[in-house]
Regions:
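Nucleotide/phosphate-binding site architecture used for ATP/NTP-dependent chemistry
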Residues: 1-233
């Protein structure tokens, strides 16, 4: 889609996609003259231009969006759906990739992009997350954009929209674990300092003490994420 406005803005989801591409490929260049731009050629007649806000020695580059599609007839601002489609189509032709594979990949990229924006819109506290020390759970819930070098860091397949809002850490949900009574012969694992039975018993005592009477030497309490529990049942 060609955009009617050229208002410059930060787009962290698009930035993750672009930084992953820059890290994994070499078919791009920096403009030799101001303004500072990253140029990705599409073919002999078209290229994508990205205004560089900061080019990082650690590859955490920042860009001002929208990107521009430059052709023989002019320069046009384009949205993320269009620029990601153009880049994926280019790679498909270059690498002879199957069309269905590329379509699935593009769909995941767009879902991740949309989810990132939904998360930021829903988390009204995101602007103050760096103003205080966070515990482990809070830190996990503060990862609103995901991996900085990933084309689809917030893809959440196979969750649907309702499940994503209920369970994904970036939505800051709270929910209880599902507990199962499992024969010890069906459980295998290791634990530091404690044996597996001791570790599971301690975890149950800390999180579901009301279930401790279900324990026996042969039946152990085993916790699962509620989505995993529903899936197995």
């Amino acid at each position: 889609m060609i955009l009617p406005s050229e208002k410059s803005a930060t787009d962290v989801a698009a930035q993750c996609f672009l930084n992953a591409l820059i890290r994994e490929t070499k078919d791009w260049q920096l403009a030799e003259y101001p303004p500072d731009e990253l140029i990705i050629p599409l073919d002999e007649q078209k290229s994508l231009h990205f205004r560089v806000a900061y080019f990082s020695p650690t590859q955490h580059h920042r860009f001002a969006f929208p990107a521009h599609l430059v052709t023989a007839s002019g320069s046009y601002p384009v949205d993320f759906t269009t620029l990601s489609r153009l880049i994926i189509d280019k790679l498909r032709h270059q690498l002879f990739l199957p069309v269905p594979l590329c379509e699935t990949f593009h769909q995941r990229v767009l879902e991740s992009y949309a989810h990132t924006q939904q998360t930021i819109d829903a988390r009204h506290d995101w602007a103050i997350l760096r103003e205080k020390a966070l515990n482990f759970g809070e830190a996990e819930q503060a990862l609103l954009t995901g991996h900085a070098f990933h084309p689809a860091p917030k893809s959440h397949e196979p969750f649907n929209r309702q499940e994503a809002e209920r369970y994904l850490p970036d939505m800051a949900p709270h929910f209880p674990l599902r507990w199962f009574s499992v024969d010890k012969t069906q459980i295998a694992g290791e634990s530091l300092h404690l044996n597996l039975q001791q570790r599971l018993t301690r975890f149950a005592a800390e999180n579901a003490p009301q279930l401790l009477n279900e324990l026996s030497d042969n039946q152990w309490l085993f916790p699962l994420h509620p989505w995993q529990g529903e899936y197995l049942l």
